[in-house]
Amino acid sequence: MTVEANKETLGFQTEVKQLLHLMIHSLYSNKEIFLRELISNASDAEDKLRFAALKDDKLFEGDSDLKIRLDYDKDAGTITIADNGIGMTRDDVIANLGTIAKSGTAEFLKQLSGDEKKDSKLIGQFGVGFYSAFIVADKVEVFTRKAGEPADNGVHWESKGDGEFTIEPVSREQRGTEIVLHLKPEDKEFADGWKLRSLVKKYSDHISFPVVMKSESEEEDKKGEEETVNDATALWTLPRTEIKDEEYKEFYKHIAHDFEDPLTWSHNKVEGKLDYTSLLYIPKRAPFDLYNREAPRGLKLYVQRVFIMDDAEQFLPLYLRFTKGVIDSNDLSLNVSREILQNDSTVESIRTALTKRVLDMLSKLAKKGGDEYQGFWDEFGTVLKEGPAEDFSNREKIAGLLRFASTHTGEATQNVSLDDYISRMKEGQNKIYYITGDNFAAAKSSPHLEVFRKKGIEVLILSDRIDEWMMGYLSEYDGKQFQDVARGDLDLGEVETEEDKKHQEEAAKEHKDLLERIKTALEDQVQEVRVTNRLTDSPACLVVGQFDMGAQMKKIMEAAGQKVPESKPIFEINVDHPLVQRLETEQGEQRFKELSAVLFDQATLASGEQLKDPGAYVSRLNRLLLELAN
C-alpha cells in the first residue's frame, strides 16, 4: 500500500468547527497569543518526555538535550515551531487535533453570544491551545512521531481550518512534533526574526526549556548558529525580588492558558522540615467547568525541577479548585504517582500549608476592599461556600471570607461580610440571623422577617441552592451563633422586651382553644400550632422544626433522586391579625376548617413551598370570594 493510499480526509468534531470559527473571528485583536499557546504546548510535550524517560531513558533516543526550535521563512510566509518532546501517534493526533475531549464543551459553546469582546474572554477561559494557530494561518501542517516508535510511524496532519483535515503516515527520523504555519497574507508580519524574538521574550521567557532560533548576527562565524532567545529558567526557582509583576502575569497565562491577568498571586519558598516552592494564582474569571467537581483541577507538580503531572489535585481541597499554579517539591520521589500522592504524609503537610496560604491571599484581598474581592466573590463565591463542610479546621477563616445579601442593603448583591454584620448588631443581640429562600425576592418578602423589620435587626438573605446545606456546617462565627429565622423557636435575646414575652405567653393561654381547633382542622398536616413572636403584619407562617430539613435541602435531595425524610411544619398564627380574630369567632366547623386550610396554604406559598393540592386551594378561595360578593 502506498503512503498516498493511506492518506485519509476526516471531519472535525462539531465543537472544533464552532471553536475555530469563533476564534478566527473573536481573537483577531490579540493575534500574537498563537505563539504563546504553541510554545506552551511544546513545553508540555518536553515535560512529558522528561517524565516518561525517568522510567525508560531509551525514549531519549540518544538526544536528551530538550529544546524548542523556532524558525521562519519570510519568502514562503511560514513559521515553524518544533519540539523534541514526547510526540504523537496517529490516534493521538486525531484525539488531540480533531476533537475536544473536555467535558461540558457543548454547554460552553452555547454560552457564546456573538459579542466579540465577551466571547474572546469566554474562549480564554476555555483554553484554546493548538487551534489558536488558525488565528494567523490559513493552513497548518503538523509532522510528528512518538518517542520510542520507529521512524516509519511518523504522522503528517494538515488542515485549512475549514471543517476537515487530512492525515497520512510519513517517515520521520526526529521524534517530537513540528508545526508549520502557512500565514494569511495579512499576517505575514509574524515571519520576522525580531518580531518572533520579542514575542518569545514577552510571553514565554520563563518556560523551563530553551527556545532556540538561528542567529541573525552579522558576524560571519555566528551566522546560522542556534541561539537561545528566552531565559529558560523556571520562574518559580528565582528569588521574588528578581521577578517583575509583568513576568508573574505572563507565567500565569502560560500555565493557565488564560488571556487575562490573574487577580493576585503568592510565591513562597519553604525550607526546613519540608522543602518546597509554591507559586499560586487566583484567576480573575471562573473557568467554564468550575461547577463540574469531576473536571481536571490542581497544580502543576514538579519534583526537583522535573515535571511530574499537570493536575495534581491532592495539594488543595476541592473548594479551592479555582487556584492555579506550580508546586515544586524536593521531598517527593521522582516516581511518584497519583495513588502515592493520596497517602503521603508530606503531601498532607504541604496541602495544609497551601490551603492556609490561599485563604490568607483571599483575606488580604478582602481587607483591601474595593472591587477586586467582590469580583472574586461574584466568580467563585458559590464554590467557596463548599468550604465549611469540607474543611473543619479552617471553618472560621472561610466564614470570614463569605459574602451575603442582607436586609441592611436590601439588594441581591452578595457584598456583606459577617464582620460587617456583627459591627451593626443591636444592643442585646447575641445571634447572627439569616433566612434561606429559593430566590432573593421571595426570601426578602418572607413574613418571617416582619419582627426583625419592626425592631431594626439585620437579617442575612441566603438564596443560593447550596446555602441551606452550607449553614448546616456553620454553627457560629466570632462566638456568635447563627439562627435561621424560619426554623425552631425564635430567640431574639435581650432585643425582645419583657413586655413582648409576657404578651406572647398570655396570648398562648388566652387562645389555647383556638390553637387546638386549628390543629384538629388541619389534621396531620402540621406537627404543632402555636402563637408567633415572628409576625407583625401577616396572619400566619410556617416554621421548620429545629432538626427538620428545610425547603432548599429537600429540593436538592429530590433533584438528586434521593428519598426526602417526612417532616411536618409548625404553624404559627398572629392572634392580633383581623383574619385570625375572624377565624376565632367562626362557629361553623366546616367553614372554620376551610378558613384554616386557606391560611395554611397561604403560609405555605409565602414560605416558598409548593402546594400539594393547588386545585383545592383555588376552589376554597373561589367559594370565599363568592360569599363576599353575595
UniProtKB/Swiss-Prot annotation:
C as annotated region, ranges: 556-630
Coiled coil location: none
GO CC annotation, single: cytoplasm
Key word Protein biosynthesis present: no
Pfam families in alphabetical order: HATPase_c_3, HSP90
Stored InterPro entries: HATPase_C_sf (IPR036890), Heat_shock_protein_90_CS (IPR019805), HSP90_C (IPR037196), Hsp90_fam (IPR001404), Hsp90_N (IPR020575), Ribosomal_Su5_D2-typ_SF (IPR020568)
Cytoplasm is among the record's keywords: yes
Record-level Gene Ontology MF annotations: ATP binding; ATP hydrolysis activity; ATP-dependent protein folding chaperone; unfolded protein binding
Keywords assigned by UniProt, alphabetized: ATP-binding, Chaperone, Cytoplasm, Nucleotide-binding, Stress response
Region described as A: 1-338
Cell compartment(s), UniProt: Cytoplasm
Chain spans, region B: 339-555
Stated role: Molecular chaperone. Has ATPase activity.
Known partners and oligomeric status: Homodimer.
NCBIfam families documented for this protein: PRK05218.1
Family: Belongs to the heat shock protein 90 family.
Record-given protein name: Chaperone protein HtpG
Lineage: Bacteria, Pseudomonadati, Pseudomonadota, Gammaproteobacteria, Pseudomonadales
